[in-house]
């Protein structure tokens, strides 16, 4: 972000940026102030998956079971303050359930323990869990986006049962602040043209759960501010601290 604003340095942004803006109190930059938004790229849903040993097959059953068995459900994540974690904490807050958070150093070890039954539930990136869902090794209860996924059309959304719930991970492009508006507009058009390629769309669908999300610079700027505010509320309410 300290690079010259000449259009030759682009930043690949993701959900961690809007989470870390609140999670880390002493960053040496201001994410919103120091970025010139260019365009959204893609979003992907998380899927709420449980080990098949959990005696529930639907989200309402899981909520009822969790409320009736306090302290019994362990929720894995890729680490304290990870997208997996805050997505789960948002669910806990909105569904009114208590789950024990078990942070791991990354998604792979968390998924390994979920598959073995050491933990019971995880909000995982759909591309990561999809092979295990198709193999019957994990049971999907819901996806976290506002609409169902083409990759998992039979799986409902969390919002179907917890009104107002929506969460997703995302990718987008930015540039150093003060990059000329004409350059930002040109980059926006070129990026949106590239991701409209049918081959790129097909490849993203093959990964499972990814949806292209092109936008104007103004739309992406508004999204970044909204997403930062959303996760700030969750982090402060749940008192999440970085590891």
Feature-to-residue mapping (PLM):
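An extracytoplasmic/periplasmic, membrane-proximal ligand-sensing/linker region
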Residues: 94, 134, 179-243
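Hinge/capping helix and adjacent helix->loop/strand transition within the periplasmic-binding protein
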Residues: 2-9, 22-109, 158, 163, ...
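Short helices/loops that flank or line small-molecule/ion binding pockets
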Residues: 1-5, 90, 94, 108-118, ...
């Amino acid at each position: 972000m300290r690079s010259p604003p000449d259009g030759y340095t682009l930043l690949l942004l993701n959900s961690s940026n809007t989470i870390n803006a609140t999670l880390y109190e002493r960053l040496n930059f201001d994410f919103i102030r120091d970025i010139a938004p260019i365009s959204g790229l893609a979003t992907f849903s998380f899927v709420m998956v449980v080990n098949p040993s959990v005696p529930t097959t639907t989200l309402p059953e899981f909520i009822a079971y969790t409320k009736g068995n306090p302290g019994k459900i362990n929720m894995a994540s890729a680490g304290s303050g990870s997208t997996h974690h805050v997505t789960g904490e948002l669910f806990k807050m909105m569904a009114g359930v208590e789950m024990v958070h078990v942070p791991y150093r990354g998604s792979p070890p968390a998924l390994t323990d979920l598959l073995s039954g050491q933990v019971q539930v995880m909000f995982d990136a759909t591309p990561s869990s999809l092979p295990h869902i198709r193999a019957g090794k994990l049971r999907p209860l819901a996806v976290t986006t506002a609409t169902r996924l083409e990759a998992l059309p039979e799986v409902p959304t969390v919002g179907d049962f917890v009104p107002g719930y929506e969460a997703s991970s995302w990718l987008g492009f930015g540039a150093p602040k003060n990059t000329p508006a004409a350059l930002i507009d040109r980059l926006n058009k070129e990026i949106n043209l590239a991701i409209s390629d049918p081959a790129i769309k097909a490849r993203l669908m093959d990964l499972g759960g990814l949806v292209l999300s092109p936008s104007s610079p103004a739309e992406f700027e508004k999204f970044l501010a909204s997403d930062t505010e959303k996760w700030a509320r969750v982090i402060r309410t749940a008192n999440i601290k970085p590891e």
